[in-house]
């Protein structure tokens, strides 16, 4: 506990300095628009690799376990995001309720996670889940989540990259709490394994504390967009229930370049086959 507090104190000292020093480098050439709640597999892979790079830069600075963003955790994160949308979960709504309860002197306050959505997916893999009591308060084991009141889901590639950058910056250096920073950096873990699997996804839900502003309809202020970063380490995987709906594929996700090369090779093979068949027919 003393070591944990020391780490939190150090993160606090660095927070204001590093937050100002870290800035996203805009790239106006990345102008293609995408719907973050309905991404193609290629774009999911693109953004996952960017998140993986940011995440591992943080881990490297702390000398902690490597993170692998792979297809299985992409599925996990996507399913959690769908759960948020299915439940109409408003993080700002939960925060408003927590403030109301705090004013009444309540100590055990709800937090923003849709723990039911997370537990429902974790259970399919036979992973441990939080108790019903903790679930009702938002308690869970696998998600770091960042929410913005800018409810736009149609963004340029540049804007999505910036949102992911801001997500990790917010996790690490928000200056208010360091539980997210500790989790992302794996700063207080005592486990002996050196791999964690992760995935990133997005969801859009109604903001129950706000309404659309007719003067700024493009901002979709009546909505909120969540960035979900889910992680499962090898220790958690080793403790799964024997009876489970899904297995967990630990295969690494290929790089975009490798995927493009594979697609090109397949296209060339198909073309060669078609050419050979055409020549045979002509003869």
Feature roles, as predicted:
Residues 1-7, 11-14, 237-283:
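Long, non-membrane, amphipathic alpha-helices that form coiled-coils
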Residues 7, 14-21, 118-122, 160-168, ...:
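Generic structural signal of hydrophobic/aromatic residues within well-ordered alpha-helices
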Residues 77, 177, 199-200, 217, ...:
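Generic low-polarity alpha-helical segments
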Residues 205-256:
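Extracellularly exposed regions in secreted/surface proteins, prominently low-complexity, repeat-rich
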């Amino acid at each position: 506990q003393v070591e944990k507090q020391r780490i939190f104190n150090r993160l606090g000292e660095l927070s204001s300095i590093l937050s100002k020093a870290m800035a996203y480098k805009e790239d106006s050439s990345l102008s293609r628009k995408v719907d973050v709640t309905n991404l193609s597999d290629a774009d999911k892979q693109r953004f996952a690799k960017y998140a993986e790079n940011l995440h591992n830069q943080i881990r490297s600075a702390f000398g902690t376990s490597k993170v692998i963003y792979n297809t299985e955790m992409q599925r996990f994160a996507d399913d959690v995001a769908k759960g948020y949308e299915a439940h109409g979960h408003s993080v700002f709504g939960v925060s408003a309720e927590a403030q109301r309860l705090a004013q009444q002197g309540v100590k055990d306050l709800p937090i923003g996670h849709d723990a039911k959505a997370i537990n429902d997916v974790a259970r399919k893999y036979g992973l441990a889940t939080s108790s019903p009591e903790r679930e009702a308060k938002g308690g869970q084991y696998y998600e770091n989540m960042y929410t913005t009141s800018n409810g736009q889901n149609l963004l340029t590639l540049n804007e999505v990259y910036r949102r992911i950058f801001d997500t990790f910056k917010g996790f690490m250096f928000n200056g208010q709490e360091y539980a997210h920073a500790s989790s992302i950096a794996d700063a207080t873990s005592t486990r002996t394994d050196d791999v964690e699997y992760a995935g990133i996804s997005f969801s859009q839900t109604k903001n129950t504390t706000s309404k659309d502003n007719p003067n700024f309809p493009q901002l979709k202020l009546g909505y909120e967009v969540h960035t979900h970063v889910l992680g499962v380490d090898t220790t958690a995987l080793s403790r799964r229930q024997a009876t489970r709906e899904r297995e967990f594929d630990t295969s690494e996700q290929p790089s975009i370049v490798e995927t493009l090369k594979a697609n090109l090779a397949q296209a060339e093979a198909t073309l060669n086959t078609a050419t050979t068949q055409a020549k045979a027919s002509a003869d």
